[in-house]
């Protein structure tokens, strides 16, 4: 986290238990890291929980200031989360598979994050796939959504500049594109931030 912040990260994603993908860490470690991150850097809990009760419980174990919901929820769950955690920001991940990718969730959260997973598989892909999706479609979503839109999905030091120019997102979310053999690669991370800030 400290290295990412030193390179210019404005948020740190802390990955809870997931059905697939790189980087999950124990809730106790998430809590420790979140407590060490200085303001104004945001701390995002990436959770695959699908009910308000479980999401609130996950947050209470970790104490981040933002929850990134990586799977689909029923609309009523958002209201229950907001009631229980009124000062916590909610970011809904939308896996871009077509023009209908952004649904009613955009109205119920503070921001959305466009990614390239596939939640319909037997073992759900909820992020960290290293695959790009259609950035022109992502641009349409940015233009029509009315909320801040983060871009994820296959971003790396070689393509981040193009992604920014094509999509014009509010922010970027990186994972597999700055890893080597499943571990965070500081050289790739530094190159990513250098390319993104050009």
Put a short name on every predicted segment.
Residues 1-171, 176-198:
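Conserved N-terminal beta1-alpha1 strand-loop-helix module at the mouth
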């Amino acid at each position: 986290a400290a290295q990412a912040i030193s390179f210019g990260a404005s948020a740190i994603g802390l990955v809870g238990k997931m059905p697939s993908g790189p980087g999950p860490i124990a809730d106790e470690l998430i809590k420790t890291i979140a407590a060490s991150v200085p303001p104004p850097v945001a701390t995002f809990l990436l959770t695959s929980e699908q009910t308000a009760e479980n999401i609130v419980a996950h947050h209470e174990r970790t104490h981040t200031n933002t929850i990134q919901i990586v799977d689909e929820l029923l609309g009523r769950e958002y209201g229950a989360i907001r009631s229980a955690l009124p000062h916590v920001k909610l970011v809904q991940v939308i896996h871009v598979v077509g023009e209908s990718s952004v649904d009613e969730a955009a109205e119920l959260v503070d921001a959305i994050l466009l990614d390239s997973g596939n939640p319909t598989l037997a073992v759900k892909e909820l992020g960290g796939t290293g695959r790009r999706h259609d950035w022109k479609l992502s641009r349409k979503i940015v233009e029509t959504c009315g909320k801040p839109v983060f871009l994820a999905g296959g971003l790396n030091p070689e393509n981040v500049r193009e992604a920014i120019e094509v999509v014009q997102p509010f922010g970027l979310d990186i994972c597999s594109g700055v890893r080597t053999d499943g571990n965070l690669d500081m050289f790739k991370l530094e190159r990513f931030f250098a390319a993104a800030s050009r």
